[in-house]
């Protein structure tokens, strides 16, 4: 940033308060969790072996946005918007939240959805999107660590597990992130799952 004022303005736009207010409060509890813009996705992690399971079609309601590659670090901001709707979506199946890469390419970026599963699309709020996620066979990985390990986890699955697994990625299906009841959306702790769609 070119000046203290520019930094303060950007900080306030992102977090809704000034750096001075946060410092004086001596607490980060009211700040939105944001992924760093640049994270090391090249370092492999040690992951437990996945479960290979077929999963039925899911109907999800939530928010979608196309992120260019240089904007992927802003995905947590979409979650912050979605979390304001959580608990108020009609026909929801349960509290588990899903992050879905509807499409991904180096050229166009990632078309990403965050949402929850619903029984049907009969009562979708006007400001939310409804999408059907096709049935697929998934390698289901559990990551017990913090949400900031997401990119490293996905990188490990793609670059270390998949080449030696006897499977290949199912390009007709979607990569799915699963945030069950143990996950704390405020702190990013509690662990999460990554479902890699696969075919033999």
Where do the language-model regions lie?
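A solvent-exposed interaction/effector surface
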Residues: 2-200
């Amino acid at each position: 940033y070119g000046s203290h004022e520019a930094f303060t303005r950007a900080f306030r736009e992102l977090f809704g308060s000034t750096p001075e207010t946060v410092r004086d409060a001596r607490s980060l509890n009211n700040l939105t969790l944001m992924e760093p813009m640049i994270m090391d996705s090249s370092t492999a992690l040690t992951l437990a072996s996945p479960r290979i399971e077929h999963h039925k079609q899911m109907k999800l309601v939530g928010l979608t946005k196309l992120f260019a590659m240089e904007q992927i670090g802003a995905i947590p901001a979409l979650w912050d918007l979605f979390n304001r709707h959580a608990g108020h979506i009609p026909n929801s199946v349960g509290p588990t939240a899903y992050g879905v890469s509807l499409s991904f390419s180096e050229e166009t970026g990632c078309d990403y959805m965050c949402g929850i599963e619903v029984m049907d699309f009969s009562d979708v709020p006007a400001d939310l999107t409804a999408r059907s996620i096709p049935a697929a066979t998934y390698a289901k990985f559990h990551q017990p660590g913090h949400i900031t390990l997401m990119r490293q986890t996905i990188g490990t699955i793609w670059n270390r597990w998949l080449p030696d697994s006897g499977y290949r990625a199912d390009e007709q299906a979607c990569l799915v992130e699963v945030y069950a009841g143990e996950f704390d959306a405020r702190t990013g702790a509690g662990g999460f799952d990554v479902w890699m769609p696969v075919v033999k």
